[in-house]
Design a protein with these regions (language model features):
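N-terminal capping/linker segments that flank leucine-rich repeat
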Residues: 1-34
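Concave beta-strand-loop units of leucine-rich repeat
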Residues: 17-24, 33-45, 53-61
């Protein structure tokens, strides 16, 4: 699964993106208002530019 500008809204709740363990291989874009990013247990090899205000990043396998 690829997370793009077109479908990222499906994973956003408030200021959090949660896409843990859903087979994500690529995240194209992270909006500037995001404070928490949870993307563990996927097949990511890199992340896009992270927002300056990001507080929490959980991205492990």
């Amino acid at each position: 699964m690829r997370i793009t500008k077109d479908n990222i809204h499906e994973f956003i709740e408030g200021t959090t993106i949660n896409c843990n363990n859903i087979g994500v291989i690529h995240i194209e874009y992270i909006p500037d208002h995001i404070k928490n990013l949870y993307c563990s247990d996927n097949k990511l090899t890199s992340l896009p530019k992270l927002p300056d205000g990001l507080i929490r990043l959980n991205c492990y396998s």
